Amino acid sequence: MYRYLGKALLLSRAGPAALGSAANHSAALLGRARGQPAAASQPGLALASRRHYSELVADREDDPNFFKMVEGFFDRGASIVEDKLVKDLRTQESEEQKRNRVRGILRIIKPCNHVLSLSFPIRRDDGSWEVIEGYRAQHSQHRTPCKGGIRYSTDVSVDEVKALASLMTYKCAVVDVPFGGAKAGVKINPKNYTENELEKITRRFTMELAKKGFIGPGIDVPAPDMNTGEREMSWIADTYASTIGHYDINAHACVTGKPISQGGIHGRISATGRGVFHGIENFINEASYMSNVGMTPGFGDKTFVVQGFGNVGLHSMRYLHRFGAKCVAVGESDGSIWNPDGIDPKELEDFRLQHGSILGFPKAKPYEGSILEADCDILIPAATEKQLTKSNAPRVKAKIIAEGANGPTTPEADKIFLERNILVIPDVYLNAGGVTVSYFEWLKNLNHVSYGRLTFKYERDSNYHLLMSVQESLERKFGKHGGTIPIVPTAEFRDSISGASEKDIVHSALAYTMERSARQIMHTAMKYNLGLDLRTAAYVNAIEKVFKVYSEAGVTFT
């Protein structure tokens, strides 16, 4: 249910007795709040003054509890959309009964449903034994299977996987991918283990998940995340298919992000970074948003900074560079580099592969200070959570913050960015490219055929016959006195009419998904007068979609 702190409408798990007076008080407060005029000239300030943040995260403003942080963002969206959900209910109930139903379903959506904690031994190459800790959280089963990555990091904790699992639920809803949210973590530093040891850990972790019913094509489908990739996903798929999924024809759909030879899909590796690019593209080309932050539309004259040169950071950098933006700085855990004339992503990638670090790159200088505070138009935090906090948010110079990482902005920092009219494109939308293409891979595995294979030659022949028909029509009309009238397509059109490959289909579908979701977020932000608060608009969209599933399915057996 809801509980109020100051002017903030918050969800809590308080008992019914404690909620009766709070419900009556909430209605009165909402009524008074709606009677106040909005400050249209500064939507960010108006929003900040109208809604406050949860006290659950305010006690540690620079290092809030990650899961409570996500719950706080959920609360903001729920407080805005509750009345609409009540109004849209088509049940033969009183207003009070409808409101109780809505609040009850919102209470179901918010918590993390299942958290599995594991410990298992492995024998290392030197003969010693080590106990490995791991977790898998399933936030919601409103849609199945659950979906979320597996990360290898010493920072993995129960709180982190719960937060990331809940983000996955809302992320999938924002981009209309029919999955519930999940996340897994293994508490290791992969740099301290050999490839043989990592394979042991990955395969044993897979078996532990399988024994507990936490993996399967229709149950729970992991994917790559921090410090994991195609190699680890291939080990997982092989382990599952060789054991518990031995008789399941869909066994390799138990995980996504696999190599092509193991049922993977073209475009998955770059999917999250490409999605970040498309997400930025949709807002940077929108004149109304650019005028609010004092920028001109388009990438042409824009500079950007990337924090984190991993999979997401690298591919985000590549696509922005390709479309005319200039990368002036890149930050990693061991240091940062700077070049106001621009850094070429391919050259930097080659240097990092050869030397193991971006430091020492000959075409850039070391950057002293925080890379998050570097002078640029677009800041892309693509590392870990809680990087932008109350302490450094006032010094951020970027006008657009594109959240490539999960949860990089704390609630207090988010509030400061709204007050400063900085456009934050939220993680719950922006880095959804990975799960979107994972969905395409999952469908490919269930259908047992690659995209384009059944139609590639048919489309190519159809387009060829169309051009020949046009040519023959022109020759019949004007004759052949000067010879034939060849129809010569341009290079771009020739590539298009040759037939869509799997990669073409994936890229096109991803671009469309990000565009459609961006339009939904813009519409919601305008509808509720949220100004630049795209995060709350995205959460409102997610809550509406998840709520509809629960409401129409019924909650008797939920």
From Swiss-Prot:
Q: Which domain of life is it from?
A: Eukaryota
Extent of the transit peptide: 1-53
The biological process GO terms on file are: glutamate catabolic process
The record's principal subcellular location, in a coarse class, is mitochondrion
Enumerate the GO terms in the molecular function aspect. Answer: glutamate dehydrogenase (NAD+) activity; glutamate dehydrogenase (NADP+) activity
Locations listed in the record: Mitochondrion matrix
Where do the annotations place substrate binding? K84
Record's SMART domains? ELFV_dehydrog
Pfam families listed in its UniProt record: ELFV_dehydrog, ELFV_dehydrog_N
Q: Which of the residues bear the PTM ADP-ribosylcysteine? A: C172
Which residues, if any, are the signal sequence?
none
PTM section of the record: Stoichiometry shows that ADP-ribosylation occurs in one subunit per catalytically active homohexamer.
Active-site residue list: K183
| Catalyses which reaction(s) | L-glutamate + NAD(+) + H2O = 2-oxoglutarate + NH4(+) + NADH + H(+); L-glutamate + NADP(+) + H2O = 2-oxoglutarate + NH4(+) + NADPH + H(+)
Q: Pull one GO CC term from this UniProt entry.
A: mitochondrial matrix
> Which leading EC class covers this enzyme?
oxidoreductase
Write the record's keywords in alphabetical order, separated by commas: ADP-ribosylation, Mitochondrion, NADP, Oxidoreductase, Transit peptide
Q: Look up the EC number in the record and give it.
A: 1.4.1.3
Bridged cysteine pairs (disulfide): none
CDD domains (alphabetical): NAD_bind_1_Glu_DH
What's the stated role of this polypeptide? Important for recycling the chief excitatory neurotransmitter, glutamate, during neurotransmission.
The entry sums up its family as follows: Belongs to the Glu/Leu/Phe/Val dehydrogenases family.
Subunit composition?
Homohexamer.
Question: What is this protein's name?
Answer: Glutamate dehydrogenase 2, mitochondrial
Q: What is the lineage of its organism?
A: Eukaryota, Metazoa, Chordata, Craniata, Vertebrata
